[in-house]
Amino acid sequence: MKNSIFKCFGITKADVTSILSDIFANSEGVLITLQEEGPIVSIKIDADDSNNRVMDKTAEIFQRLNNYIYAEEDISIYEAVFRLMKLNHLTLATAESITAGNVSACFVKYNAGASQILLEGNVVYTNNAKMRMLDVPEKVLNTHTAVSVETTYDMAKGCLNKSGADIVIATTGYAG
């Protein structure tokens, strides 16, 4: 059996289905399956007999979805980002509220040698932690709330200034 896989981010399964509807309709001899896990859509292409069929469908799918494809193998987005950052000698720090450290934890979980890129992870769940650890101004928190673009920006800026990382990820949001 010949097969191929694409891992996509930033697009829903419904949108992938719509974009590829004509490919699904004309895929005799080729099995194309979609699986959505959170923000990730996996596209698997299998054929019993012809490598050309898989290659043709793979090329068509890649052409249409290349802005969303982060890997052509079965890896997590954390692994793909880690590889790119390592290749480009970039470092990362996180400022996490809603995710409570999960982003940095996933980089460590999925990547042996994560310390090559991950400098630090800050969990700043309370307003006090945001002010104390990341220098988020109290005025910004009071005026715009902890769950705002302005606060997230100041979290990222504070993390960038304090960590010296090349790239910072900041998260905030409503827990429920």
Residue ranges and their predicted role:
Residues 23, 52-176:
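Short alpha-helical segments enriched in small residues
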Residues 30, 41-43, 167:
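Conserved beta-strand core positions
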Residues 37, 46, 172-174:
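Short loop/turn motifs enriched for small/polar and acidic residues
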